[in-house]
């Protein structure tokens, strides 16, 4: 599901709210989540999961085109850990 599909689905389920208001709310929520993570804070949504930053240590990688070794710097990457309820609901396909 893309962001625009999410907005369309929410707008159709909440017909009393203008589609533009739904779009603005979704965009604002995602922007707030991104800025919270950028500040190094953790986001927890009970029953859904948590978002945090994990440190990826420096390492030697390879250029896929040339095969040359490339030194990659350490960096923080976003990480999502699903909550138990989400894991249980997703397990109906497994």
UniProtKB/Swiss-Prot annotation:
Q: Does the keyword Ribosomal protein apply?
A: no
According to its UniProt entry, the protein's GO biological process terms are:
DNA recombination; regulation of DNA-templated transcription; regulation of translation
What SMART domains does its record include?
BHL
SUPFAM superfamilies attached to this UniProt entry? IHF-like DNA-binding proteins (SSF47729)
**Top-level lineage group:** Bacteria
Q: NCBIfam families per the record?
A: hip, PRK00199.1
Known function: This protein is one of the two subunits of integration host factor, a specific DNA-binding protein that functions in genetic recombination as well as in transcriptional and translational control.
| Protein family membership | Belongs to the bacterial histone-like protein family.
Protein name per Swiss-Prot or TrEMBL: Integration host factor subunit beta
User: What species does this protein belong to?
Assistant: Salmonella arizonae (strain ATCC BAA-731 / CDC346-86 / RSK2980)
Q: What is the gene called?
A: ihfB
């Amino acid at each position: 599901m893309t962001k625009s599909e999410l907005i369309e689905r929410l707008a159709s389920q909440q017909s009393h709210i203008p589609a533009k208001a739904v779009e603005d709310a979704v965009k604002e929520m995602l922007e707030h989540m991104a800025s919270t993570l950028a500040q190094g804070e953790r986001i927890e949504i009970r029953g859904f999961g948590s978002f945090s930053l994990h440190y990826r240590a420096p390492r030697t990688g390879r250029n896929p085109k040339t095969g040359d070794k490339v030194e990659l710097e350490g960096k923080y990457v976003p990480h999502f850990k699903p909550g138990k309820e989400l894991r249980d609901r997703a397990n109906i396909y497994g």
